[in-house]
Amino acid sequence: MNKTLLSLMLLLLPLSSFGQYVRGDVNGSRTVDIADVTALISKVLSSGGAYVQVCDVNYDGAVNIADVTELIHYVLSGVWITPDYTGPSIPENAEIYTVNGVSFAMLPVEGGTFMMGYGDTEYAYPGSHASHQVTLSSFKIGVTEVTQELWLAVMGTNPSPDQSDVSLLPVCSVSWHDCKNFIDRLNELTGLNFNFPTDAQWEFAARGGTLSQGYLFAGSDNIDEVAWWADENATSWTWHPAFVGLKKANELGLYDMSGNVSEWCYDDDWIVNNSNVAPMIDPVYERASVPNEALRRRIMRGGSRYDEDAFGWEFCTVYSRDRVRVYDNHKLFGLRLAIWP
């Protein structure tokens, strides 16, 4: 066969895609060909242009020569070196909910007693609780962060900067009040009682609940096994969310509770500074009123890929907390759903 004709046939091979995402379509033409290779090489050499997940064709969280190699291989052979990623494995005991044609998984979490906050040998990151005993009733929590696809199904809009794959990217650039509106609308559509996780529920789930192995991060002591995060060498090319569920799950089967996007919790700004407090049962803190809602702060958990400094890992520990104004909507703020007792 003529080599030129063979090359043209290879460039027209079926595309790997899910939703609106076309893997390897760097230039947005809806086809994958040599022009995408050229565009990707340009991005790698210059670090120019806004990052989108479509540039990370091998799903390793970086955009570099390895992605160029993989894309060239696909253009020439029609086969990806790294298999297509279509979503995480869902625990067998998860419950599936559907709204406007979009399904998502919630995991029942058996209640129990645990020590919440940082221990005696752990770094006391500002804003974190001192260690204290908490007992929780059973609840349910999202297996993954809320995706853009689910947000779109509920709200009809998508505030996220990178919308290259709405089915697998977490929604981001959302304030606490944006998320509250989303939850209220979701409850109207389903007749159920979804909510944010409480501060204590979030930490218990991140630690692995009654199956906890005592890890520093959600599922491992090795942050790279379970979290997309940033250090002092981070650049704007790493300040973006990754597909949900690419990293290892924690003991319960929950993904990305360390890193990726920071997750809003229900509680108002509060902190336990002294370990000598009475044991707590199902704690949740909400002020009855505040003088200025714009200055109100709610708890945020998990860290993200934007938390870049020499101690960026610290933001991603199971006990680390932040207190953020309720109308702030940073590009790596997201959420995870819960259902309370």
Question: Predicted regions span which residues?
Answer:
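Bulky hydrophobic/aromatic "packing anchor" residues in well-ordered structure
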Residues: 26, 109, 114-116, 141, ...
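Short aromatic-cysteine micro-motif
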Residues: 101-102, 124-210, 233-256, 341
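Cellulosome-associated attachment modules in secreted, modular CAZymes
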Residues: 5-86, 159-163
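Active-site Gly/Thr loop motif
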Residues: 219-252, 301-333
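Surface-exposed recognition segments
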Residues: 122-132, 210, 257-341
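Acidic glycine-/aspartate-rich tracts in secreted/extracellular proteins
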Residues: 45-49, 77, 112, 119-121, ...
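Residues that flank catalytic or metal-binding motifs in active/ligand-binding sites
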Residues: 22, 53, 102-105, 110, ...
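GGW-centered surface loops in extracellular recognition modules
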Residues: 85-111, 115
